[in-house]
């Protein structure tokens, strides 16, 4: 497995791959000052290697890189994560230590389901979503391309729109539209992002 991006997020993915017995072949990063990460070589040009995981935490940058590379993508799922056999996980997605993904949940491409996050039954997680550590998505929640902050709770049957940023510790009790910054308990829209 190759990684694109040599930063802190890549270190966690390396740990996941090693714990899963998956060989890390190397990393690629645009920064010419980085030559290695955790003992693995870092190159600065992409020459078609695959499979790949984009090891960049920023959702929009992850999307831009995926659209630019157009290669085959793998997945990284830590052995301590609990996944229902009916859950679907898209290519390029990372599921970290202690995460739980329940029955009939559908997680899109290039997502991050971070440490201890809980994605309950029938949730639909769009491409490029980041569910931060210990966030809880109750049943039948829909999220599109957004960043869900650490410790956030979303009650059942709600939607968070595309490209939102939800602040840490928020409690979402009503639908959130596209392109907003929102946080609080209860979660409130602070401003529109686009």
Locate each region found by the language model.
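Hydrophobic, well-structured mid-protein blocks that either form specific transmembrane helices
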Residues: 70-122
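Glycine-rich hexapeptide-repeat left-handed beta-helix
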Residues: 1, 115, 124-127, 132-194
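Short alpha-helical
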Residues: 8-11, 60-61, 171
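Short amphipathic alpha-helical segments
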Residues: 14-16, 64-68, 107, 177-178, ...
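Redox-cofactor binding/interface segments in oxidoreductases and associated redox assembly factors
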Residues: 52-55, 95, 183
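Hydrophobic, well-ordered beta-alpha structural blocks that scaffold small-molecule cofactor pockets
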Residues: 1-45, 93
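Phosphate-bearing ligand-interacting subdomains
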Residues: 32-84
